[in-house]
Amino acid sequence: MNETLKQELLQNIREVKDYPKKGILFKDITTLLNYPKLFNKLIDALKKRYTPLNVDFIVGIEARGFILGSALAYALGVGFVPVRKKGKLPAHTLSQSYSLEYGNDSIEIHSDAFRGVKGVKVVLIDDLLATGGTALASLELIKALQAECIEACFLIGLKELLGIQLLEEQVKTFCLLEC
C-alpha cells in the first residue's frame, strides 16, 4: 500500500475522545465512507492485495467489517460471510464465546456459511483490531467450518493493545494503518 493512500485515510478518520467510554480514543471510519473516491481507492488497494491469493470468501465481523467486507467481496467477485453477535443470524449457527474487559460475549456464523465446502480460502476483515478477542473468536469459527483463513485484514491496528501480536500467532495479519 502506498504512503499517500495511508495518509489520505488517516486524514479522513475522525477521532472521538471518551467514546464509547471515558479514556477511549475512538477511530470513526464513517467519515472516510463519506468520500467515495477515497473509499474506492481503499477497496481497489485491498483488491490488488487479495486477487493473487484466489480467495473464495470474505468473512466480515459485525458491524463495520460488513461495510469493508461486502465492498471487497464484490470487487473480488467472491462470496461474503457475516460473523454476527449471538442471536442475530436466522438459521443454524456455530457459536464462539470470548472474553471482554468485563465479562464475556459470543459471536456466531451460519453453519452452512461456506456452502458446505471444506478447505475454502477466506480473508477475515474488520475496521479495527484492538485486543483481538473478536477476531480470535471469528478465526475459531472459520476453523470449525474447516475453512482456511489465509489472512486477517484490518483498516486500523492499535499496536499498544497487543491484538496484532496475539492474532499473528494464529494467522497472517495485515493492518493497513497501525496507530
Swiss-Prot record:
Gene3D superfamilies per record: 3.40.50.2020
GO biological process: adenine salvage; AMP salvage; purine ribonucleoside salvage
Alphabetic keyword roster: Cytoplasm, Glycosyltransferase, Purine salvage, Transferase
Main subcellular location of this protein, as a coarse class: cytoplasm
Localization per record: Cytoplasm
GO molecular function: adenine binding; adenine phosphoribosyltransferase activity; AMP binding
Keyword Transferase recorded: yes
Domain of life of the organism encoding this protein: Bacteria
Pathway assigned to this chain's UniProt record: Purine metabolism; AMP biosynthesis via salvage pathway; AMP from adenine: step 1/1
Keyword Cytoplasm: yes
UniProt similarity note: Belongs to the purine/pyrimidine phosphoribosyltransferase family.
Function: Catalyzes a salvage reaction resulting in the formation of AMP, that is energically less costly than de novo synthesis.
UniProt-recorded name of the protein: Adenine phosphoribosyltransferase
